[in-house]
Amino acid sequence: MPRSVWKGPFCDNYVIKLARRARGNPNVLIKIRSRRSVILPAFVGYTFGVYNGKVFIPVKVNENMVGHKFGEFSPTRTFNGHSGDRKVNKK
């Protein structure tokens, strides 16, 4: 279920503080670990490094991302593919 409208979007306070510090320079990578925070309109144009459990993945925020969460743009699992042609052909 989605969040109630009357509560408003959730964003960790330290994410907002880091974005305010980088207000003058939008090219700086803002490293965050909060995948649960919602992308606010004030974050458009900034580059966030979203932690996926191993590395910080750079995410350049644009207008289409507003309202989504940071975790949606940094995958945590890698898919190596299925074996495919390795199967033995029985004759």
Swiss-Prot record:
**Which family is this sequence assigned to?**
Belongs to the universal ribosomal protein uS19 family.
Q: Which GO terms describe its cellular component?
A: cytoplasm; small ribosomal subunit
What biological processes does GO assign it?
Answer: ribosomal small subunit assembly; translation
UniProt-recorded name of the protein: Small ribosomal subunit protein uS19
Q: Name one GO molecular function term.
A: rRNA binding
Report the HAMAP family cross-referenced here.
Ribosomal_uS19
Query: InterPro entries in the record, alphabetically?
Result: Ribosomal_uS19, Ribosomal_uS19_bac-type, Ribosomal_uS19_CS, Ribosomal_uS19_SF
General function of this protein: Protein S19 forms a complex with S13 that binds strongly to the 16S ribosomal RNA.
The answer, when asked if RNA-binding is one of the entry's keywords, is yes
Task: Tell me the keywords, alphabetical order.
Answer: Ribonucleoprotein, Ribosomal protein, RNA-binding, rRNA-binding
Superkingdom of this protein's organism: Bacteria
| PANTHER family per record | RIBOSOMAL PROTEIN S19P FAMILY MEMBER (PTHR11880), SMALL RIBOSOMAL SUBUNIT PROTEIN US19M (PTHR11880:SF8)
Q: What's the source species for this entry?
A: Neorickettsia sennetsu (strain ATCC VR-367 / Miyayama) (Ehrlichia sennetsu)
Pfam families according to UniProt: Ribosomal_S19
